[in-house]
UniProtKB/Swiss-Prot annotation:
NCBIfam families: PRK13262.1 (NF009761). SUPFAM superfamilies: Urease metallochaperone UreE, N-terminal domain (SSF69287). The keyword Cytoplasm applies. It is found in: Cytoplasm. GO terms for cellular component: cytoplasm. Residues 204-231 have a biased composition (Basic and acidic residues). SMART domains: UreE_N. It comes from Yersinia pseudotuberculosis serotype O:1b (strain IP 31758). This is Urease accessory protein UreE. Residues 185-231 are annotated as: Disordered. The keyword Chaperone applies. It comes from the Bacteria. Pfam families: UreE_N. GO terms for biological process: protein folding.
Length: 231
């Protein structure tokens, strides 16, 4: 096993490494979005190298990271991360709305995303939602809930990853298929206090839990079945 404790550079972001490896052969270490969030893992490259990744805590691999380079053979071990696509919802339009409309829309959007068990991160007046179903279904949910006035589009996860902190990347890509959702929808005013609206864990599906000093039941449908659960 070859132990990897440091990242040498990034062939996509670092012009020095891009130039250095322009004629090199890439031996890819292909990771899915779950594996990419781990600072320690063991996996073989496409050419069969047994690699043990042991990075510092909170250091995660990025697409294009160079893990090893043999100058004699001109072969570089480079990370390739396969991330799922992301729905990007633009909240900028809400800045022109009244405070009441802004709060109402943010709350309803948070509820709609949470009700679908979709994880989300908000940043730079946008909401990022990793795809867990077909784009046609996500498009339908947005329109069914009356969010046609909010522009949204679908982009590659690799385009969003550089905009995120490590913790945000873990939330968005580290197991987006999980059903225990933590939704975070904020006011597009980008104010840390006061008028900033933050909604966490809009819809969680554990066992019964309480809100304040009361409990209540509700039910909803998933596909071809219904179920009740407590809040």
């Amino acid at each position: 096993m070859i132990l990897i404790e440091h990242i040498l550079g990034n062939v996509k972001k670092d012009p020095v490494w891009r130039e250095k490896l322009k004629d090199a052969t890439f031996d890819l270490l292909i990771l899915d979005q779950r594996e990419a969030q781990k600072s320690r893992c063991r996996k073989s490259s496409t050419q069969g190298l047994d690699l043990g990744i042991s990075l510092d805590r909170n250091v995660v691999l990025a697409d294009g990271d160079v893990l090893a380079w043999d100058e004699e053979t001109n072969v570089a071990v480079v990370v390739q991360i396969n991330l799922r696509d992301v729905m990007v919802i633009d909240l900028s339009e809400l800045k022109s709305r009244s405070p009441d409309e802004l709060i109402k829309t943010c709350f309803e959007l948070g509820h709609a995303l949470g009700n679908q068990h979709w994880k989300a991160v908000t940043k730079h007046n946008e909401v990022y939602v990793p795809l867990t179903v077909a784009t046609t279904m996500m498009d339908s949910v947005m329109r069914t809930h009356g969010f046609q006035h909010l522009p949204f589009r679908f982009v590659k996860g690799a385009e969003i990853l550089p905009l995120l902190t490590n913790s945000e990347a873990r939330l968005l890509f580290g197991g987006a298929e999980d059903t225990d959702t933590h939704v975070h929808v904020a006011s597009p005013l980008d104010e840390p206090h006061g008028s900033g609206l933050h909604i966490h864990g809009i819809h969680s599906h554990g066992e019964g839990h309480s809100h304040g000093d009361h409990d209540h039941d509700h039910s909803h449908s998933h596909g071809d079945h219904d179920h009740d659960h407590k809040h």
